């Protein structure tokens, strides 16, 4: 999808630091193939720097409230660098791609079974600049309306600006129920020749 560095080995300081990030790998034992994966770190394993800031792969993007650090982080897994191997991506017509994301979620579910204290997943999701800007604005508005962080637990250092007229979006997403607004979002994004990104759908 265009993510990562494009290098044959995509390793950074978070992979080699003391108590580094771990890898969740989804394996197809019949074909002996890697299906996909995530990089993750348990909140209980997060260390703080000299200024008291968490050493996280997302720390350059977000400011974390004390409430989040004390009450949520110990019960959280930070996720990042998700991928589905090309042969298993949903754009492929064969059956391989149909259940790839489901298998990935099964892997995340397995983590919560192994670590029953975990209640939350946290991380960033990439939407590329090539994605239709109006479509992106509609998705952002919809997510802020129905899943907004009212307690300011995690705040972006550089918030994404919605360029589409706010009143227009308010009139478009005028329903009180999530499902009704979602139907509008899906219809409008498709009318632009786009699809809602799979991870956006999955995380909702």
Spell out what each predicted region is.
Residues 25, 32-42:
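Conserved beta-strand in the GNAT
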Residues 16-25, 48-49:
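A short helix-loop-beta-strand connector motif used in the catalytic cores of GNAT acetyltransferases and
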Residues 1-20:
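An N-terminal domain-cap segment
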Residues 2-6, 33-37, 118-120:
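Short secondary-structure capping/junction motifs at helix and strand boundaries
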Residues 10-15, 26, 63-69:
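Catalytic micro-motifs at enzyme active sites that drive phosphoryl/nucleotidyl and oxygen chemistry
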Residues 46-204:
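Acyl-donor binding region in acyl/amide transferases
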Residues 20-22, 36, 75:
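Residues that flank catalytic or metal-binding motifs in active/ligand-binding sites
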């Amino acid at each position: 999808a265009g993510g990562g560095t494009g290098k044959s080995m995509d390793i950074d300081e978070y992979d080699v630091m003391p108590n580094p990030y771990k890898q969740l790998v989804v394996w197809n034992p019949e074909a002996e193939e890697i299906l996909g994966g995530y990089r993750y770190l348990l909140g209980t394993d997060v260390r703080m720097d000299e200024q008291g800031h968490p050493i996280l792969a997302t720390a350059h993007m977000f400011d974390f409230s004390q409430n989040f650090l004390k009450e949520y982080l110990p019960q959280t897994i930070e996720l990042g660098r998700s991928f589905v191997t090309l042969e298993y991506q949903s754009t492929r017509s064969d059956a391989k791609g149909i259940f790839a994301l489901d298998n990935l979620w099964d892997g995340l579910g397995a983590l919560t079974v192994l670590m029953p204290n975990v209640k939350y997943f946290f991380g960033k999701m990439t939407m590329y600049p090539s994605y239709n800007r109006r479509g992106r604005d509609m998705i952002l508005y919809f997510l802020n309306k129905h899943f907004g962080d009212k307690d300011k637990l995690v705040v972006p250092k550089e918030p994404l600006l919605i360029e589409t007229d706010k009143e227009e979006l308010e009139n478009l997403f005028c329903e009180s129920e999530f499902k009704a607004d979602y139907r509008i979002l899906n219809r409008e994004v498709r009318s632009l020749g786009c699809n809602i990104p799979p991870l956006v759908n999955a995380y909702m």
